[in-house]
Amino acid sequence: MGMDERGEPGGAVKVGMIWGGIGGVVGLLVSLPGSLVGIVVAGFFGFSCGRRAAVAERRALSGLIGGAVAAPGYMLGSTLGALLTARLIGTAEIAATLSDVLGTQVSADEAWIYFLFSLVLSAMFEAVILISVSSAAGAWTNKE
């Protein structure tokens, strides 16, 4: 980030847009092994985004604004990464694994529905974590 962007109005939104684009790619790559990795990385990503947004705008809410703008891009990339992995694994394998874990028969269609529901929950957790950590990082950076 250049020196001319420090303290300018709208800087947190710009940072959020940039980090949202980066987050889409990062989210996709880190979620290929599974959604849990995407949830964990969302915290680190939110911290970086919040600090940069706070430097860009120097307002108390800049971390929150940057995180809220970046979160949808990260969530979309993360969800796409998990979907790609699930399609490679296949619904039959997911159903077999769920059947073994739950001790009951799960059809491929039911397994796919459970998987999609888990993606929605994962995306919500990622958004909450990313925005919360980004807000805290922004406040912490402005406090220094």
Q: For each predicted feature, which ranges?
A:
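Juxtamembrane/disordered regions of integral membrane proteins
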Residues: M1-E144
